[in-house]
Design a protein with these regions (language model features):
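Short coil/turn segments that connect the beta-strands within blades of beta-propeller domains
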Residues: 24-26, 66-68, 120-122, 239, ...
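Cleft-lining beta-strand/loop regions that shape enzyme active-site pockets
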Residues: 359, 446-456, 470, 475-667
Length: 668
């Protein structure tokens, strides 16, 4: 059964984005969608605004171990983020606070983020994108700075030394000194009754009050002795620090993509006493550590593991994926939940309404009275009987805004069985006169990409258009039995086909093919190739052609594939029909606006344009009514920049942006 909260509080306006509790006092720190940072004193119910941004939301709030300081990330501009500190000045019980002014403690080159205090109060860890080590492109003249992030630390006291430099010390003594302790007035001795109580009930672990020397703190920055990379988290432990690193991989994943490897991160631990860095775990998405720093939890896809923090897992346990106390893996299959769907759907509906109210791009919601809209559609909640009807209700409500990119997708739908059909990358038609299924067209696609060509185009098969398909897996085909029926559950599997070439005696032959899971990319490639062939034939090779399917990863890849190989043509047709949108249109426009300034002329060979890969010919853009979102913006920008003629139909017209970071309670 649902339970009512024991106590409620008056919170700041806007949506609460992050909420972090103090390890020592009854305090909560809240960041809001209105770009403010607040502290809620649970004891008094009072809320104090600590800081606000004029650029973007404040992120990554974290308390010091004694609860007297707060660190967080704040934008200085759209291009710079820095770490800030606020001294909360709490009394001994945390009931009263006198917060100081926010102090910027890092001098960013690009982005400083993810602060975390050393549990012993010596350092503040953080991540920073400030390494400009160019990685040269292998297909064009250009560089990228994909590995720009490193972990760093700030020494919080002037006397604290660089922990990566070995310090002389006596055998058995700690290599790093304890942090300075702010002196406090002596407290009264406990009375006899208190002495008789269990110590765990009357006393919490003694944590010295942290002293931070703010003067010159920006200059007390130390980099970790690790290579730059794609780091995402840094977490302090006693005499150790954890950080996660994500591998640098291509953006296109899955079947037919260039990157099918595991995209999850690596969890590292640096031991200050040993001055060693080693891998704790692989395939890590996110890490959490309890307040004592003794236990860590990490997510691996849909799995959760709990281990002793900072301790290397023995090999026999690392390879043990079965749930147990020893391995640390939780058995989530044991979890059972009871759901009142009417209550859940009601909450989800209101949350969807609230998200639009808070985040729609203009405050007036395009003149729509959003409260009236809520009452109109909320009255239908009691009449819906399925999850899909809830989706329909939310869609209809959002449709009142008359805007683009107002989506709702995913969620807790009942499992529906899947019957994947193996694809042959071909069009087949049954011919009654021949009593056979005939290959009308074979989509060869890119024969050099394993998942993007017809399996019939593999070397040695010699299957041609107009050949007959007689059997699949030894089962005969006829007018009432189609290839699709016999390819159910055969997607991605090796299948035996019996094929015949008409007009040849004893031409029946058996071949083994591995069917495709999806043949969309194979058909798409054939379509692009046919368009290119037509343009080249009609222009005698003087004009090039390329298609951009979206303004995302696939689109930027297709653009460069076509552009770089045809940049020296006298003209170039750019086709954005059916473009599904995205965000990379500025990158494409940047390429198209570059023009020749001169030539590099070698003694032998052909002159090369300067700058490299720049156009010398005319441009034409083809578009249609199915070109949308960033495809809209690209088409309009192409016209505004007068890059060339635009031919086709008016585009979709949906350029209100999207923010897909929010989820409803069932995962929607």
């Amino acid at each position: 059964p649902s339970e009512q909260p024991e106590k409620s509080y008056s919170l700041p306006v806007g949506r609460i984005q992050e909420m972090v509790s103090s390890p020592r006092h009854p305090h909560l720190v809240l960041t809001t969608s209105r770009m403010e940072l607040h502290l809620l004193n649970i004891a008094s119910g009072r809320t104090i605004k600590l800081d606000a941004s004029k650029v973007r939301e404040i992120n990554d709030p974290v308390f010091s171990p004694d609860g007297s300081w707060l660190a967080y990330t704040k934008h200085l501009s759209l291009e710079l983020t820095a770490i800030f500190l606020v001294h909360l000045n709490p009394d001994s019980e945390g009931r009263r606070l006198k917060p100081g002014k926010p102090v910027q403690i890092t001098d960013p080159v690009r982005y400083d983020f993810a602060p975390y205090f050393d549990p012993e109060g010596r350092w503040l860890y953080f991540l920073s994108a400030r390494i400009f080590n160019p990685i040269w492109d292998t297909v064009q003249t250009g560089t990228t700075f994909s590995r720009s992030i490193k972990p760093y630390l700030l020494t919080l006291q002037e006397v604290t030394c660089n922990p990566f430099l070995p310090q002389p010390h006596a055998p058995g003594a700690a290599e790093t000194p304890p942090p300075p302790v702010e002196e406090k007035a002596p407290t009264a001795e406990p009375n006899e009754a208190e002495k008789g109580k269990n110590e765990s009930e009357t006393q919490s672990p003694r944590i010295p009050q942290l002293r931070i020397d703010l003067d010159g703190i920006q200059e007390r920055i130390v980099e970790f002795p690790v290579p730059e990379g794609l780091y995402e988290q840094v977490i302090g432990l006693p005499n150790k620090v954890l950080f996660t690193e994500t591998p640098l991989l291509g953006a296109i994943h899955g079947e037919g993509g260039e990157t099918d490897e595991n995209t999850q991160g690596v969890l590292w631990v640096h031991d200050f006493e040993k001055q060693e860095c080693e891998v704790l775990a692989q395939e890590v998405d996110q890490v959490e550590v309890n307040p004592s720093g003794k236990t860590m939890l990490y997510f691996c896809g849909n799995q959760i593991r709990i281990l002793e923090a900072g301790v290397t897992v023995p090999d026999e346990l690392e390879n043990d994926g079965s749930p147990s106390r020893k391995s640390g893996w939780l058995d989530l299959s044991r979890v059972r939940i009871a759901i009142n769907y009417q209550d859940e759907w009601s909450q989800m509906f209101r949350e969807a309404w609230r998200l639009q109210k808070e985040f729609f791009w203009n405050e007036q919601l395009s003149g729509v009275d959003w409260n009236i809209i809520y009452r109109r559609y909320e009255s239908l909640l009691s009449r819906i009987g399925s999850r899909s009807e809830l989706s329909d209700l939310i869609w209809e409500m959002q449709g009142e805004l008359g805007t683009s990119h107002a989506y709702e997708y995913g969620g807790d739908y009942p499992f529906s069985p899947q019957y994947p059909v193996g694809q042959l990358g071909a069009d087949l038609e049954y011919e009654p006169s021949r009593k056979a299924w005939v290959f009308r067209k074979i989509y060869r696609g890119d024969v050099w990409r394993s998942h993007q060509h017809s399996p019939l185009a593999e070397p040695g098969h010699s299957v041609q258009e107009n050949d007959h398909l007689l059997e699949i897996g030894g089962l005969p085909l006829d007018g009432s039995t189609s290839p699709g029926e016999l390819l159910v559950h055969q997607a991605g599997q090796a299948v035996q086909l019996t094929v015949k070439t008409p007009g040849k005696k004893q031409s029946n032959r058996k071949i083994i093919v591995k069917t495709l899971l999806h043949e969309g990319k194979t058909r798409y490639r054939e379509w692009v190739k046919q368009n290119l062939k037509f343009v080249e034939e009609q222009s005698s090779g003087r004009v090039g052609y390329l298609h951009i399917p979206d303004m995302d990863t696939e689109g930027i890849a297709e653009f460069h594939r076509g552009f770089l190989s045809q940049v020296d043509r006298e003209g170039l047709i750019i086709d954005v029909r059916f473009n599904a949108g995205g965000w990379v249109s500025p990158l494409v426009l940047e390429k198209l606006t570059h023009r020749h300034l001169g030539y590099d002329v070698p003694r032998w060979g052909s002159p090369e344009s300067y700058p490299y890969h720049t156009l010398r010919g005319h441009l034409v853009l083809i578009t249609n009514q199915f070109t949308g979102s960033d495809g809209d913006m690209f088409t309009a920008s192409f016209k505004q920049l007068k890059l060339g003629k635009v031919i086709g139909k008016r585009t979709w017209g949906g350029v209100v942006g999207i923010d897909g970071r929010y989820h409803l309670v069932d995962g929607t």
